[in-house]
Structures are given as C-alpha cells and as structure tokens.
Amino acid sequence: MYALPPDVFEAFEPRVTGITCPECAGVLEVQREGHGNLRFICRVGHTQAVDELLAGKEDKIENDLWAGVRALEELVALLGDLETYASRHGRVQTGGPHDRRIAQASDHVRRLRAILDEKRPVDLAVAGE
C-alpha cells in the first residue's frame, strides 16, 4: 500500500491516493499544482492543501482516540453494573466473571488518556513553527 502514487510529482492529472478525506472518509485524489505543491480532493469536493490535510488527519486521530476512551469507559461502567446486578441476585462467582475485562478496559483507558494528555496524539509541527 502507498499513500501517494509513485508518479505523483510527474503526473499532471489527478491520481488516486491510498488515503482518505479527514472530513468524509472518501478516497482522496492528489493533483500537482504550480511550484510542486499538492492539492488533495475527495469525490464529495473537499479540497485540502498538504498542511490542511495533515491538520485534518491529526484532528481526526485525536477525535477517534477520544471516542475510544468514551467507548471503553462505557464498557467498564456496563461491566461493573452487570457485576453489581449479579451479586445482588446471588449470581456472582468469586472474582466476578467480568473482573478481567474491566481491568483490561481500564488499562486501555489509562494508556489512551496518557497519549491524549501529551497534548496531541501525533505531533506534526514543522521545524520553525
């Protein structure tokens, strides 16, 4: 798999890339513009220069990681509630059947939050910025 087609800097017409639009997840085409600049366009019409595409990808990654944190926290809460329900109705076993899953999901939440607390999941800052 490649992100940019090998002939992108020689081609004049748009080329399909191996990356998706950060706004709609549609396939991006890349087109060379004057002075060797690249412009990315999806089928819906979203158009981005390289710096806009990188910023959009970074924001998408961060949003997706936060969605993962929320989903895992909901899983921990649900499993905890199921454990409580089971124990109130005499169905709990020693160690609870969901304890391992709760511990794993809680650990994943901790690790994702550590990444997100570093400010950005991916640092795409260019030297001199």
Residue ranges of model-derived segments:
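Short metal-coordination and nucleic-acid-contact micro-motifs, chiefly zinc-binding Cys/His arrays
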Residues: 14-18, 38
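Short cysteine-rich clusters marking metal-coordination/redox-active sites
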Residues: 21-25, 39-42
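Short Cys/His-rich "knuckle" micro-motifs
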Residues: 30-34, 51-53
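Cysteine-rich micro-motifs
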Residues: 36-48
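Short metal-binding segments enriched for Cys and/or His
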Residues: 46-64
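Non-transmembrane amphipathic alpha-helical segments
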Residues: 65-68, 72-86, 105, 112
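Short, charged, amphipathic alpha-helical segments
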Residues: 92-103, 127
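Amphipathic alpha-helical coiled-coil segments
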Residues: 104-122
